[in-house]
Amino acid sequence: MIKQYLQVTKPGIIFGNLISVIGGFLLASKGSIDYSLFLATLVGVSLVVASGCVYNNFIDRDIDKKMERTKNRVLVKGLISPKLSLVYATVLGIAGFALLYFGANPLAMWLAVMGFVVYVGVYSLYMKRNSVYGTLIGSLSGAAPPVIGYCAVSGQFDAGALILLAIFSLWQMPHSYAIAIFRFKDYQAANIPVLPVVKGISVAKNHITVYIIAFMVATLMLTLVGYAGYKYLVVASAVSVWWLGMALSGYKTQNDRVWARKLFVFSIVAITALSVMMSIDFMTPASKDLLTYIG
């Protein structure tokens, strides 16, 4: 039973988000780490993400059973009752928000609330099923964790937080479109209006290329504005150029599914590399904050 309760929280997604939280947190810490704050932020975000994933599993159980990738999920197979899953999700969310509020700061909690509302209320409940722009809206919630990690330390939403939001939002787009291409039949069977299904794979390839170029620019801004050093810049540039090269190779590929899977895998390598580099090659910018939270 414990295994099912763990599975429904999507541990892989939680782990991936924690990497970005750590990146944002350590970027803002600039070598001076408050370990109790660090722990509270990691656990708090983990609980909120877990809550969102359980709610998502509850909402998506009707379409999950139509997809090969998701047909064996806990709620689809009835291993946990829908009502119990809602209670579980609610408890996880309340615990996570409370921990961020009292263990970090109110700004971190409110950022988590906004990310949660976008993911569960806007994306999962409506946009995913009804709009080709669902991925774009969902990317905002996917970018929340590193911003929460950053603001847990800084206590303010400044240019650094805005750049992180841009980097991780833009990264989500080619990452998600790649999944939609190599899982094309799944999304088609479930009638989910993702771009590759609605507009075609060739159009999706164009969007992937444009978003990766925008991602390249956003990653460079951390150094150009003064938040990260030149070691980060070198890695960010190399990763972005390689990812763009992979995207461009898609125009000549004979097998879109294989190409998209490779692009997806490298997207994870890319964002992990950036998270690690911003954690260790940080700087203090001369510019001041855009928006300061006053508690």
From Swiss-Prot:
It comes from Erwinia tasmaniensis (strain DSM 17950 / CFBP 7177 / CIP 109463 / NCPPB 4357 / Et1/99). The chain crosses the membrane at residues 8-28, 35-55, 84-104, 107-127, 132-152, 162-182, 208-228, 229-249, 263-283. This is Protoheme IX farnesyltransferase. Carbon 2 of the heme B porphyrin ring is defined according to the Fischer nomenclature. Gene3D superfamilies: UbiA prenyltransferase (1.10.357.140). It is found in: Cell inner membrane. One of its GO terms (cellular component) is plasma membrane. Its EC number is 2.5.1.141. It is a multi-pass membrane protein. GO terms for biological process: heme O biosynthetic process. The keyword DNA repair does not apply. CDD domains: PT_UbiA_Cox10. NCBIfam families: cyoE_ctaB (TIGR01473), PRK04375.1-1 (NF003348). Keywords: Cell inner membrane, Cell membrane, Heme biosynthesis, Membrane, Transferase, Transmembrane, Transmembrane helix. Converts heme B (protoheme IX) to heme O by substitution of the vinyl group on carbon 2 of heme B porphyrin ring with a hydroxyethyl farnesyl side group. Pathway: Porphyrin-containing compound metabolism; heme O biosynthesis; heme O from protoheme: step 1/1. It catalyses: heme b + (2E,6E)-farnesyl diphosphate + H2O = Fe(II)-heme o + diphosphate. Belongs to the UbiA prenyltransferase family. Protoheme IX farnesyltransferase subfamily. One of its GO terms (molecular function) is protoheme IX farnesyltransferase activity.
